[in-house]
């Protein structure tokens, strides 16, 4: 019977990494892994890109300090023009926000406050709903199906005269599921005639399904659809807080009135550079794929069921209460995802660097095979 140590030695070559001194880590991994001294534990809990900021973005930020005395309006307008060209829309359709979270919140505030309804799957990313509730919105929760994917048929059935927004996070956080392309297009086409459909595409860059559509195409057709994008994930800029919304101009104009936080000049300039740094973009995607393979290998070894992920995290059936597994892993030096009701025996783990993933694997084996 294969022991834990044997498995570590043989699986994907990671055993050698765990059992060897740090000096033999690959040159690529050493040069791109920068330990964050602020957090004494490995953080696989927030779906961040641990390889960012790219060197090009860091240099752009350094050269942009001279502009720190200026208000960011013109800089943001220039970024909006760059994004409009990238996505094939007008600059009036772009709203620069302080991270995509601000975009979600101000959309909920704009359209659903004071008694409006938001229809949303559950579990999902909660920023829009929790904020809108504070301003008098009601939330109509639709549980995900057995496959952890959205039940779009049920969501559409629940649309009523009081429904103002339908929220989709696609791929979904925390489940990592992806709505089938045709089903997504058909749903947005139909539902957007009755209410505004909001498509959160924070993890869109990680999708590997060929020709998978962004709902920006629905915006271009003039549908009542809003799309959110972020620089926090594949671009590795979570700490800089910059994202954007895309909507037809008349919808964008309503949202723009409620923007609270201006993105600062350094974040805007960093975003401009990130859009041009394809080498780092591809590097991040490649590292994410490799990290997911290692985690899948572990979960298969432990006979733990998981959802095939289209993101930079994996949602798996832990067979333990996450409120117990979380502290146990933290004691091993690894922080994993929080509870996502009602799935208290499921766990979301982010893909960190390969070195971080190997420490996660080591901790999991110690817990599950002790």
Place the predicted regions along the sequence by residue.
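N-terminal "arm"/small-domain region of PLP-dependent enzymes with the aminotransferase-like
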Residues: 14-70, 85
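Active-site pre-lysine segment of PLP-dependent enzymes
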Residues: 152-159, 174-197, 201-232
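Phosphate-binding glycine-rich loop
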Residues: 78-117, 131
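N-terminal secretory signal peptides and thylakoid transit peptides that target proteins
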Residues: 1-15
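PLP-dependent aminotransferase class I/II
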Residues: 224-300, 304-307
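PLP-dependent aminotransferase-like
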Residues: 110-168
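PLP-dependent enzyme catalytic core of the Aspartate aminotransferase-like
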Residues: 328-332, 340-370
